[in-house]
Amino acid sequence: MINPLLELKEVSYKNKNNFTLNKVSLRIKSGEKIALLGKSGAGKTTLISILNGTLKPYKGRVKLFNTEFDKLNLYQKSKISTIWQDLRLIEDLSAEQNVNCGLLAKQSFLFAFKNLLNISSFNKAHQYMQVCNLKKSIFSKNIRKISGGQKQRVAIARSLIQESDILLADEPFNNLDPKLTSNIKNLLLITKNKNKIKVPNTTLISLHRLDLLDGFNRIIGMKNGEILFDLEKTKLKKYHLNKIY
């Protein structure tokens, strides 16, 4: 059996007195395009936070590349990038500086700090911003002065510049119009790269819109901190969805 890229074994997470994840087991293999479904409060954000190491499980084990997460070095952890639902942009920086923050994942803080504000280091950031349909006119603008949809795409470009193997995304299509949603979804689920940039080969994206399921090959449904179904996209039926909505 091929080892998964990322694995949870009987993971539970406790927030105060409540379990927001309850004995969740999950194996993510290379090349999978996974949609994570469930109502607000189902545990999707907690699951993503456990998968990327932001939260430590109350019980259970998390492995990346068959290695316990707490034993990984900085470079190994950088193989996972995340698009957060609340974006987590730095308001005192420009759009291009925020994108460059994605480089923090692979570099020491001192190196990144010295180069973050260096204009000559923005070429790569601009490339990823353009792929995310951001116009040159907003590159140097303070993040406070751009629209919600533009901020969303800055956060996406920041995750892509990290050039990770695995992308975790929490509702990444909020604030995007239908055309941009389609373009960005195709970018995140890409199988043939026409833009000559590195895009993660493996993705897990939480969604609430069922009309966005095209392009995914695996669907996971959550409710009350538990996985109620985990199946191939072709096997998804209405009764599965009725379990979680």
Q: Could you say what each language-model-derived stretch is?
A:
Residues 68-84, 118, 238:
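ABC ATPase NBD coupling module
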Residues 37-39:
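The feature captures the beta-strand-to-loop junction immediately N-terminal to the Walker
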Residues 142-146, 150:
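Conserved ABC ATPase signature
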Residues 167-171:
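Catalytic Walker B motif of ABC-type/P-loop ATPase nucleotide-binding domains
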Residues 52:
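Helix-to-loop junction immediately C-terminal to a conserved catalytic motif
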Residues 156:
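Hydrophobic anchor residue at the start of the ABC signature
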Residues 178-180:
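Helix N-cap at the start of a conserved alpha-helix in ABC-type nucleotide-binding domains
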